[in-house]
Amino acid sequence: NASEKEELQIKDKEGELILSKIKDNMFVVAMDLNAKQMTSEEFSKFIETQGVMGNSNIAFVIGGSLGLSQNVIKRANHKICFSKMTFPHQLFRVMLLEQIYRAFRIMKNEPYHK
């Protein structure tokens, strides 16, 4: 197991890599355990609001197993907590994609599985 200092160094290094991929015009949404959780309907409204506000270039940022660096959290325009549980990175990507798909179904008043 890594020490607290080593974990911080790992998060900072991951954070630098993440921030290097984020463009200035992106609306950044960080997946953060300390943020507010949303229902699917609230998430749909959030996505819709971003479109209305002209934020069509949204970057969802998923941290590693240690979470996100403070620099990434500071860069985020918004933070969301999907769950207090830990998920494998690849699985969470699918879960996030499914929620984005569901959000657009809700916006269009189309049926979706509850």
Name every feature range the model reports, one short phrase each.
Residues 63:
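Rossmann-fold NAD(P)-binding glycine/threonine-rich loop
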Residues 70-114:
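Structured adenosyl-cofactor binding patch, chiefly the S-adenosyl-L-methionine
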